Amino acid sequence: MRLTQYLASKLKNFSNLPKEYIERSKKQVYWQTPKEINYLPRTVERKRFRYTTNRSWTGQFRQQNMPGTVRRKVLVEPIEDWSFFRGDRIEVLVGKDKGKQGIVTQVIPERNWVIVEGLNWHYRKVGGEKEFPGIIIKSEAPLHVTKDIRLVDPSDLQGTDFEWRFTEEGEKVRVSLRSGRIIPIPETNNQTHDYKTPNAYIEREKDTPGAVVGEITFQPKLSTFEMDIMEEMGIKEERTPVKSYWY
């Protein structure tokens, strides 16, 4: 469970949505104590979700995890260093597209999956009803990152194994074990729903400028909140406190 929560946090990089919004959109609370002073905060809520290719803040994800449904537990192998990103060129190692190369378009770290553009696809029917047979669409199936794909070396465009290393500047990079060439992380990985690159983003009226965010406005003091209000309002304390004793 902890692994799933950790991997789910990586989705924010693509969604560019507040973490509180993502957690609230998938939250399913069955019961909670009243918000009174004589109650401890306790809730009964769903903690296990079935993750698929649908993002956790979408309606499709909620439909697949409707309240009250029990799904078979999926065991996921933990990956310490996630090494595949959107925009990576990879080589397929299994299936009908074995040996072909493609570009990663979607990453699902909760299941150790990636989706490659135009590869490992199949036909499926959607929109079927009683009076409408539905339509057939082409859909790419996910590939497992530990056994179904491998990265392509940019020096010779051949599949290769790699490892993480540190440069002299302390930057962590992927290095091909065959050629020693650095495999850079694509710029596509920085894209979100709001912008292609962070530098190309245009600030809007409701955005907080970076200069305002970095401005230090808090000044630590020994005075209490009430003392600060009195100082700003020009109120002087002229009363003499009464003697008190502690036993």
Curated annotation (Swiss-Prot):
InterPro entries noted in UniProt: KOW, Rib_uL2_dom2, Ribosomal_uL24, Ribosomal_uL24_CS, Ribosomal_uL24_KOW, Translation_prot_SH3-like_sf
GO cellular component: mitochondrial large ribosomal subunit; mitochondrion
GO BP: any one term: mitochondrial translation
Pfam family, one: KOW
Compartment(s): Mitochondrion
Residues of the KOW domain: 84-117
Key words, A-Z: Mitochondrion, Ribonucleoprotein, Ribosomal protein, Transit peptide
Segments passing through the bilayer: none
Listed GO MF terms: RNA binding; structural constituent of ribosome
Top-rank taxon, per record: Eukaryota
Keyword Zinc attached: no
Family per record: Belongs to the universal ribosomal protein uL24 family.
Quaternary data: Component of the mitochondrial ribosome large subunit (39S) which comprises a 16S rRNA and about 50 distinct proteins.
Protein name: Large ribosomal subunit protein uL24m
Naturally occurring in which organism (per UniProt): Drosophila melanogaster (Fruit fly)
